[in-house]
Curated annotation (Swiss-Prot):
<dbReference type="GO" id="GO:0050660">
    <property type="term" value="F:flavin adenine dinucleotide binding"/>
</dbReference>
<keyword id="KW-0520">NAD</keyword>
<dbReference type="Pfam" id="PF13932">
    <property type="entry name" value="SAM_GIDA_C"/>
</dbReference>
<dbReference type="GO" id="GO:0005829">
    <property type="term" value="C:cytosol"/>
</dbReference>
<dbReference type="GO" id="GO:0030488">
    <property type="term" value="P:tRNA methylation"/>
</dbReference>
<keyword id="KW-0963">Cytoplasm</keyword>
<dbReference type="GO" id="GO:0002098">
    <property type="term" value="P:tRNA wobble uridine modification"/>
</dbReference>
<comment type="similarity">
    <text>Belongs to the MnmG family.</text>
</comment>
<comment type="subunit">
    <text>Homodimer. Heterotetramer of two MnmE and two MnmG subunits.</text>
</comment>
<dbReference type="Pfam" id="PF01134">
    <property type="entry name" value="GIDA"/>
</dbReference>
<dbReference type="Pfam" id="PF21680">
    <property type="entry name" value="GIDA_C_1st"/>
</dbReference>
<dbReference type="InterPro" id="IPR047001">
    <property type="entry name" value="MnmG_C_subdom"/>
</dbReference>
<protein>
    <recommendedName>
        <fullName>tRNA uridine 5-carboxymethylaminomethyl modification enzyme MnmG</fullName>
    </recommendedName>
</protein>
<keyword id="KW-0819">tRNA processing</keyword>
<comment type="function">
    <text>NAD-binding protein involved in the addition of a carboxymethylaminomethyl (cmnm) group at the wobble position (U34) of certain tRNAs, forming tRNA-cmnm(5)s(2)U34.</text>
</comment>
<dbReference type="InterPro" id="IPR020595">
    <property type="entry name" value="MnmG-rel_CS"/>
</dbReference>
<dbReference type="InterPro" id="IPR004416">
    <property type="entry name" value="MnmG"/>
</dbReference>
Length: 647
């Protein structure tokens, strides 16, 4: 049957990508339908019970800055919070949280069920409605046809998923859930380039059978307890609990090696490539043969369950081998496994077939987000989902697509990497992937993106008001520090030395003094009995005041580095956004090698910047493209001229 209501946007899948996509489109005022095979699994954490980490936490902050749900849901469900790399520079500091699976999922579902313009429907999708070269809807397993002006696919590991435990395997999207076999077949009919990847998960352990007395506790940060969202508060957090640490040993490794002849990875049963930076335990033992021990973190799955997640023991070995390797580790000698570990193979679709908006180049109105694009991780999925939802909404509204630049957001780095370079293994975000990471910090994600989010329609009034209060406070106090001057007459050496290490010899602004190593905003404000402190607190809420202080201190201390990076962005960006026509005939560009012509024709980059990052495209080739565009050929279709270009 044809459903009687036509929607603006349909989102297929209710994981981390799908939920953010649906919420974003609905916040923009689009009539949105989220189709999921099971409403009870909306927002489910399929693998590890944690959010964030290096690079990943940055993405979560960006999703939050654009009004997304992940950070606030983590604040409501987080049972341990830590700042990683806290002793290092601000660019690589990252928030990580352990989450109670039940509380996190409940927080996401609550937002979905109470979001205006968003409807939910429980049915697996088996087909897409395509008319000409455009998608116009989706068909569920019982034949219900839903029509829409845009469709966002966020199918995760469900597309033709196959689960492996030892040499046994069966179809499934994840343990306990069916695979999306028909939908995968339909996408293949559309001739979209695709491949196979794999990921895995460890066995889960009954905490009642763990001997914690011999294990090392790893508590979270307690003074202060971090929050994830820019709107987060510590009183949102449930009870905080520790993780625990154990280690593999030579016996563990011997057990694994002896079982490799029954491993689907090492017997050729699994064809998909797994994530390099989250390897299975058998892969670790093989790749790092010289190491006699690996650290394993025992992470609680929640406050109302005894289930523990042994982070670092992802495996698809046979169950008897899993049991032996778990029992070989200290504190786990008598552990009971609640769920076996497994590997899962699934289809992904080459992200080089997507525009920067995450819309398919081949099928109009069809957007892809999450693991279907070859990424791994909740955070990468959520960020893509948010962007796909925004761009689906913009398309419905007849507006131009939006994608952040590489110098503007980790989300921009993620998308640009995917659409220009593609993937040969599951893609994970790291701070090292960003050229401009000093400007792309967790602490300033709101300063980078919230105003854009407001213009796009995904940032509500409460977030916008909070952002403006923070931005104004940072600006006001920064200007005060720059305009408040001290000299030796009013700041004697005896008062200066405890804070500055020595007396001052000339006039300085407070901002000048704050730039010095080991001088903090707090110590500066305490100088001479608080003489230089602001008349009023930076904010009424202590947490907000701390965020403002951090922004001020980083902005002043790293001003020179950030300014140099901004100059580099401007220099490199002169031709970054110069458009390349969709029907560009690269054979007409004199001097381009056949290899370069073929690669450009295959990838169809939208801009000079994208073209420059395709493997094998040399700076000389980019120069030839620019010369060709400046000549105004291609039947009058040229990219926008940069400043100073001839007419």
């Amino acid at each position: 049957m044809l459903y009687p209501v036509e929607f603006d946007v349909i989102v297929v899948g209710g994981g981390h990508a799908g939920t953010e996509a649906a919420l974003a489109a609905a916040r923009m005022g689009c009539q949105t339908l989220l189709l999921t095979h099971n409403i009870e699994t909306l927002g489910q954490m399929s693998c590890n019970p944690s959010i964030g980490g290096i690079g990943k936490g940055h993405l979560v902050k960006e999703v939050d800055a654009l009004g997304g749900a992940m950070a606030l849901a983590t604040d409501e469900g987080g049972i341990q919070f830590r700042i990683l790399n806290s002793s290092k520079g601000p660019a690589v500091r990252a928030t990580r949280a352990q989450a109670d699976r039940v509380l996190y999922k409940a927080a996401i579902r609550h937002r979905l069920e109470n979001q205006p313009n968003l409807m939910l429907f429980q049915q697996a999708v088996e087909d897409l409605l395509v008319e000409g070269d455009r998608v116009v809807g989706a068909v569920t397993q019982v034949g219900v046809r839903f029509r829409a002006r845009a469709v966002v696919l966020t199918a995760g590991t469900f597309l033709d998923g196959k689960i492996h435990v030892g040499l046994n395997n069966y179809t499934g999207g994840r343990a306990g859930d069916p695979a999306a076999v028909s939908l995968s077949a339909r996408l293949k009919e559309l001739k979209l380039p695709q491949g196979r990847l794999k990921t895995g998960t460890p066995p889960r352990i009954d905490g009642r059978t763990i001997d914690f007395s011999v294990l090392e506790a790893q508590p979270g940060d307690l003074d202060p307890v971090p929050v994830f969202s820019f709107l987060g508060r510590t009183d949102m957090h449930p009870r905080q609990v520790p993780c625990w640490v154990t280690h593999t040993n030579e016996r563990t490794h011997d057990i694994i090696r002896a079982g490799l002849n029954r491993s689907p990875m090492y017997t050729g049963v699994i064809e998909g490539v797994g994530p390099r930076y989250c390897p299975s335990i058998e892969d670790k033992i093989h790749r790092f043969a010289s190491k006699d021990s690996h650290q394993i973190f025992l992470e609680p799955e929640g406050l109302t369950t005894n289930e523990f997640y042994p982070n670092g023991v992802s495996t698809s070995l046979p169950f008897d081998v899993q049991l032996d390797l778990i029992h070989s580790m200290r504190g786990l000698e008598h552990a009971h496994i609640l769920r076996p570990g497994y590997a899962i193979e699934y289809d992904y679709f080459d992200p080089r077939g997507l525009k920067a908006s995450l819309e398919s180049k081949a099928i109009g109105g069809l957007f892809f987000a999450g693991q279907i694009n070859g990424t791994t991780g909740y955070e990468e999925a959520a960020a893509q989902g948010l962007l796909a939802g925004i761009n689906a909404g913009l398309q419905v509204q007849g507006k131009a697509a939006w994608t952040p630049r590489r110098d503007q957001a980790y989300l921009g780095v993620l998308v640009d990497d995917l659409i220009t370079r593609g993937v040969t293994e599951p893609y994970r975000m790291f701070t090292s992937r960003a050229e401009f990471r000093l400007s792309l910090r967790e602490d300033n994600a709101d300063m980078r993106l919230t105003e854009a989010g407001r213009d796009l329609g995904v940032v509500d009034d409460a977030r916008w008001d909070a952002f403006n209060r923070k931005r104004d406070a940072v600006s006001r106090e920064t200007e005060r520090l720059k305009s408040t001057w001290v000299n030796p007459a009013i700041l004697p050496a005896a008062d200066a030395e405890p804070v500055l290490g020595k007396g001052i010899e000339r006039e300085y602004s407070l901002a000048d003094l704050l730039r010095r190593p080991n001088v903090t905003y707090e110590s500066l404000m305490g100088m001479q009995g608080g003489k230089y402190a602001p008349d009023a607190p930076l904010a009424d809420e202590p947490l907000l005041a701390e965020q403002i202080r951090e922004q001020i201190e980083i902005g002043i201390k790293y001003h020179g580095y950030i300014a140099r990076q901004a100059d580099e962005v401007e220099r490199l960006g002169a031709n970054e956004n110069t458009r390349l026509p969709a029907d560009f005939d690269y054979k007409q560009v004199r001097g381009l090698s056949i290899e370069v012509q073929q690669k450009l024709a295959q990838h169809k980059p939208e801009t000079i910047g994208q073209a420059s990052r395709i493997s094998g495209i040399t700076p000389a080739a980019v120069s030839l493209l620019l010369v060709h565009l400046k000549k105004g050929v291609l039947r009058g279709k040229v990219g926008p001229r940069s400043e100073g270009e001839a007419a």
